[in-house]
């Protein structure tokens, strides 16, 4: 090859590299909202106690942090497992359960789903369960 052709080819390669480096960055996907899901005990969401207080915390996080918050009310003890499974299907990032009555169902569900995060209000486990926080 002639010296001129080599010089031209080198300039084209360098120019191509510079143009590629200056290209716009691919648009990043917006971060998905964190979904926090609460299951009440049989007292309902407006019990003026633990259920209402926990839900108020989630509502505050929705407003201040931009998370997504949902709840399911348990009308009877038999609803606990059904509600836990519903939120597992919805792929909640954190499932908050409220009250000692839901403690056994929360533990069983957490142990069967170790990659899901749980929190329980008004209950503690001894020994602690690895994926249940806020005990």
Residue ranges and their predicted role:
Residues 1-34:
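Short, low-complexity disordered leader/linker segments with a strong preference
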Residues 24-135:
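A residue-level marker of the well-folded mature domains of exported/periplasmic proteins
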